[in-house]
């Protein structure tokens, strides 16, 4: 069983997270919007309201221990790029970006 983090829990991210759970993996779901985290909290291993553009937050959540991270941040390309840079900085090796 692999451990994944899904950052951005809108339509795409939530679908990816639930599919990974159905495949038997552990999933940490992360979003800055409370409503998205609440919508998926019962379906994933852990759901966290957090700012994924903050490198310290990603480090505190031990995201580097995940087998892979899916970045599914919606329309905000700057936030998506910043998140990926921080993930690389903390040592995440497998990053999949929408």
Regions found by a protein language model. Give the residues of each.
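Cytosolic regulatory regions of ion transport systems
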Residues: 1-98
């Amino acid at each position: 069983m692999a451990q994944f983090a899904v950052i951005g829990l809108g339509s795409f991210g939530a679908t990816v997270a639930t599919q990974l759970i159905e495949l038997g993996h552990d999933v940490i779901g992360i979003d800055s919007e409370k409503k998205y985290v609440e919508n998926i909290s019962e379906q994933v291993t852990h759901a966290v309201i957090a700012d994924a553009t903050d490198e310290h937050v990603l480090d505190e959540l031990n995201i580097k221990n995940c087998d892979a991270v899916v970045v599914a941040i919606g329309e905000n390309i700057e936030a998506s790029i910043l998140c990926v840079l921080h993930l690389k900085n903390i040592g995440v090796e497998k990053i999949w970006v929408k």
